Swiss-Prot record:
It comes from Prochlorococcus marinus (strain NATL2A). GO terms for cellular component: cytosol. The lineage of its organism: Bacteria, Bacillati, Cyanobacteriota, Cyanophyceae, Synechococcales. CDD domains: SIS_PGI_1, SIS_PGI_2. InterPro entries: G6P_Isomerase (IPR001672), Phosphoglucose_isomerase_CS (IPR018189), SIS_dom_sf (IPR046348), SIS_PGI_1 (IPR035476), SIS_PGI_2 (IPR035482). GO terms for biological process: gluconeogenesis; glucose 6-phosphate metabolic process; glycolytic process. This is Glucose-6-phosphate isomerase. It is found in: Cytoplasm.
Amino acid sequence: MNNNDKWARYCDLLYSDDSLGFWLDISRMDVAINDFEDFNEIYSKAFDALESLENGSIANIDEGRQVGHYWLRNPKVAPSPEISDSITKEIQDISKFGSSILNGEITNSDGEKYTDVFWIGIGGSGLGPLLIKESFKRESIGLDLHFLDNVDPEGISHKLNSILPNLNSTLFVVVSKSGGTPEPLIGMEQAMKFVRDNNQNWSSRAIAITSKGSKLDLLAHNENWLDIFDLPDWVGGRTSITGAVGLLPAALIGADINKFLNGASQMDALTRVKDIKNNPAALLSLAWFKSGNGKGLRDMVVLPYRDRLEVFSRYLQQLVMESLGKKFDRDENQVNQGIAVYGNKGSTDQHAYVQQLRDGIDNFFVNFIEILHDPLEIVEVKNKRPGDYLSGFLQGTRSALTEGGRQNLTITFKSFDESSLGALIALFERAVSLYAELINVNAYNQPGVEAGKKAATKIIKLQKEIEELLDDGKQRTLNEINDALSSDSTESIYLILRKLSENSDHYSMIGNQSNPDKLIISKT
């Protein structure tokens, strides 16, 4: 393709919106102009499905739930006055709470301002707030955020001890829709013990984000926690960032939450247009579909050329992979769908895996994210402007990939602020919703995650049974333990006991670890 043809194709496939300062270029993806006509019928159905979802239909059929994260940034589109009013009130309450913390109306027991937040949440309840922090921490006039998003004992110990110097001025936020998810529950229990062991009051500094009537909601009310914010059952964790899960950390670091919501709402409006060529989410989802032949045959590589978006690829991993990675479609056909997502940041990628992207296996497409405006405080030194080099690296990598026949698309924003982040998140949320309609999967459930939780619960139950069996002090082989417990996995018993023996002197495994079936197990 010569230069004139490339330019003509670029102009034909470019989408832009002046109000958001936004461009989407899919000209280097496997999309043809006639695809707009060929896909018109299936997209017409997808647009109608998304409209029905926003109108309050039970879109998550498996769980019998509405899907309402699009209402969060524009309460007026919610399907009932009750929902609309509750969203509006929540936004106002969070804004007021954030201001009260920042201006010192709410203080610790010594009358001092809070300086830190210890955030306990897993999955989207941790990734969303982390993205908020990383995106706006340079403009922050507020609190420093720390995250506990795992049950790694070493990680828990390190993170709790790291806040010890400022413990008296640290808020604790616990995020759990049900209040029973193991990771945030264990994190909360450890944090609670840590605070009390250091002679501090937990309830006066604890905040819950949870569903009304949940175990966490009841606990927070009974113990008179500092505040409680709502996580409705019609909002999933991976799409909760425009609710309390994202707004509270934004408010606590001094970001403009209304600007963030307005950006998302503006993008929602652009992506309600029922015309593929004039709908950026439709263009994006079509590019994904064509690239992977509708079967997710290509990975999505996310390369934002801006440090503040470094964790965006991790955020998209959950949004895209948990939403689209499904074994069965909605008609119960086995389809094994999904798109794998990974990424880095530019120009770090230049010195990491771009080598393989350019010359290795062709099983991906690249999603570049570009920000045009550079901060004024970084000036030219020795005739070099860092922003020019960053842009040059992006354009150069893009050209090198195209020359190698590698598909790529570019999302560009004029500047990066709360509005553009809200718009960027909304763009991908809407593209995921439309893509799910194209491949006929439920984007709002997570049966694989639930299966993992059930399996983990089974392992914990088995461990307790092993401990009780070995309380008699008798020596046994693994097979004898397995038979006594009528277990279906000797391997699981071995793995449990290997862990126990490493962490407790009461358990012993005598014998050669290379022959685990010969080991003699006992408890003293």
